[in-house]
């Protein structure tokens, strides 16, 4: 869930383009949730919604202008100081803009060899339940990201070497062949990624010539070195963290990258971006709902579209809990998860918007979500592997079932509860689910079904476009009540959530089309004759008028805007 989404966290996660609010009459009064959902539904139809909804020509035009705006000025006194070849190892940072590792590689050499390693472990199975580690939709998104990254590097005089294999085998071999003394890369925080860093470093040492791996921090809005406390003293409560960094930290300026980065060394075969079939993955086409376009250019295009073209940033706080349509939230999280855009770039675009248009609670709330994303990344360092354990960071003891049939009903959208089934249908069809939906389906799996929360977390890992381990597992531990903050133990009442966030049943009718012919008041409670039996009774409330115990809030606490597993807002 976390991910990020912005949650700003997703297997997830997050970025669906919903309704177009620029057609609404905007006043100083907050928009009611019912009016938002009605407008959202009016804009949705059976067609696929491309995100961003820009033509290829528009995406390219926006990208060119943005790259120029954020480029290192030609008049800058900064010059390259190093000699020889450096290797730039791309990981979850598939961008040119604000790429600290790229800048460091450029400034410390006279030749850069950019490399992406298609690690076969990425397409193995998850740790506990053997689900596909990378589903077809996220795999396809990744391939689009690589195509776009190569294109943007070539515009700057570079290229992208693509090799299939383990980085700890590929990178030392390349360092030896090209005489590179340093491999630059961005630092990751979770155990699988850190293990690969260790193996790469060991392999480079065996090359000799003092060859080394130099890791750069570049994945958060607030830099790790600027925190007002050691990361292992990170507050257990998000609000304490947020208030501390807002009061005591500055956000560094994004790194300006020169428009010309060449040359590259002579390479006989740069390698092709493979098809999913070559990676052993059956491709999947989006047949309904949101179809996200991978790559830095599309990510930059989405920021332009949401902030500037549709002017939706000013109403983000009022709409962020929507469920239907492409524009109720930013949908930046898939690009954040792959590092196609950086949180600092979004921060600077928010600042520009506040200067040129308006500054209000909505513009701040996007940053609020980015701080959540930072928090989960820092938390993954503090908690280590306990983030993946059943009892979570606090080693909470509980009774958890691993009933496979029950889990499959959740996974396959056959629980008998339309709100759950619609969300799970959207996830499997698009690779995305709203923040609100993620919180609801997590609560249902953990509290109503009593299932091991890791089953849900690993399925999100399979499906979400915006999956990243920090946000995903951070959000799931919170949702399961085993997270860092002992106050996180919330139940989401399905009747209450349906009433508050899909009052007309438009969302469930969009994803479960057999419900569309029913009266709106019946769509969430169609009965077994019109729908199917429910697989479990609800812990709290079994009818349309039922309330809920401790329902409401978000995975992240009392802030209902918290992004389930997203990587961004």
Curated annotation (Swiss-Prot):
Biased composition (Basic residues): 559-569
GO BP of this protein: photoreactive repair
Domain named Photolyase/cryptochrome alpha/beta: residues: 84-221
Binding-site list for FAD: 316, 329-333, 466, 468
Cofactor: how bound: Binds 1 FAD per subunit. Binds 1 5,10-methenyltetrahydrofolate (MTHF) per subunit.
Residues where ATP binds: 436, 485
Function noted in UniProt: May have a photoreceptor function. Binds ss- and ds-DNA in a sequence non-specific manner. Has a photolyase activity specific for cyclobutane pyrimidine dimers in ssDNA.
Protein name: Cryptochrome DASH, chloroplastic/mitochondrial
Organism in which the protein naturally occurs: Arabidopsis thaliana (Mouse-ear cress)
């Amino acid at each position: 869930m976390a991910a990020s989404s912005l949650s700003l966290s997703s297997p997830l996660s997050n970025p669906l383009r919903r309704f177009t609010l620029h057609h609404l009459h905007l006043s100083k009064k907050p928009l009611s949730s019912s009016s938002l959902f009605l407008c959202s539904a009016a804009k949705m139809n059976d067609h696929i919604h491309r995100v961003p909804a820009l033509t290829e020509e528009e995406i390219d035009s926006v990208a060119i202008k943005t790259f120029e705006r954020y480029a290192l000025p030609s008049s800058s006194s900064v010059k390259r100081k190093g000699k020889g070849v450096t290797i730039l190892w791309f990981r979850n940072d598939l961008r040119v803009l604000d790429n600290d590792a790229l800048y460091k590689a450029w400034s410390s050499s006279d030749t850069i060899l950019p490399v992406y390693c298609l690690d076969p472990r990425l397409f193995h199975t998850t740790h506990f339940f053997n689900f596909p580690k990378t589903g077809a939709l996220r795999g396809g998104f990744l391939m689009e990201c690589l195509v776009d990254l190569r294109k943007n590097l070539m515009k700057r005089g570079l290229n992208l070497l693509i090799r299939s294999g383990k980085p700890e085998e590929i990178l030392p071999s390349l360092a030896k062949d090209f005489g590179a003394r340093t491999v630059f890369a961005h630092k990751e925080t979770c155990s699988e990624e850190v293990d690969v860093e260790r193996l790469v470093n060991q392999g480079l040492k065996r090359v000799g010539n003092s060859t080394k791996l130099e890791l750069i921090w570049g994945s958060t809005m607030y830099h790790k070195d600027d925190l007002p406390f050691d990361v292992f003293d990170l507050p257990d409560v998000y609000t304490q963290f947020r208030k501390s960094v807002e009061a005591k930290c500055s956000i560094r300026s994004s790194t300006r990258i020169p428009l010309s980065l060449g040359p590259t060394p002579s390479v006989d075969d740069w390698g092709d971006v493979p098809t999913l079939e070559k990676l052993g993955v059956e491709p999947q086409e989006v047949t309904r709902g949101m179809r996200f376009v991978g790559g830095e250019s599309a990510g930059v295009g989405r920021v332009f579209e949401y902030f500037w073209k549709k002017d939706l940033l000013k109403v983000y706080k009022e709409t962020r809990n929507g469920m239907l349509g492409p524009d109720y939230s930013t949908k930046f999280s898939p690009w954040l998860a792959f590092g196609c855009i950086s949180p600092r770039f979004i921060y600077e675009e928010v600042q520009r918007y506040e200067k040129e248009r308006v500054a209000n609670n909505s513009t701040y709330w996007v940053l609020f979500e980015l701080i959540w994303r930072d928090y989960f990344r820092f938390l993954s360092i503090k908690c280590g592997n306990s983030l993946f354990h059943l009892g979570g960071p606090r080693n909470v003891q509980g009774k958890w079932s691993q009933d496979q049939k029950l889990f499959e009903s959740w996974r396959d959208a056959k629980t008998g509860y339309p709100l759950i089934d619609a969300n799970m249908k959207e996830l499997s069809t698009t690779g995305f689910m709203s923040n609100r939906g993620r919180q609801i389906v997590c609560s249902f799996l953990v509290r109503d079904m009593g299932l091991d929360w890791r089953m849900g977390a690993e399925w999100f890992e399979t499906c979400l476009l915006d999956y990243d381990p920090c946000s995903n597992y951070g959000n799931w531990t919170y949702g399961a009540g085993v997270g860092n903050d002992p106050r996180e133990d919330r139940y989401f009442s399905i009747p209450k959530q349906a009433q508050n966030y899909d009052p007309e049943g438009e969302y469930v009718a969009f994803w479960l089309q057999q419900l569309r012919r029913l009266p709106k008041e019946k769509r969430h409670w169609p009965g077994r004759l019109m729908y199917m039996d429910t697989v479990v009774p609800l812990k709290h409330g079994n009818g349309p008028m039922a309330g809920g115990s401790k329902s409401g809030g978000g995975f992240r606490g009392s802030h209902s805007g918290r992004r389930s597993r997203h990587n961004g807002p």
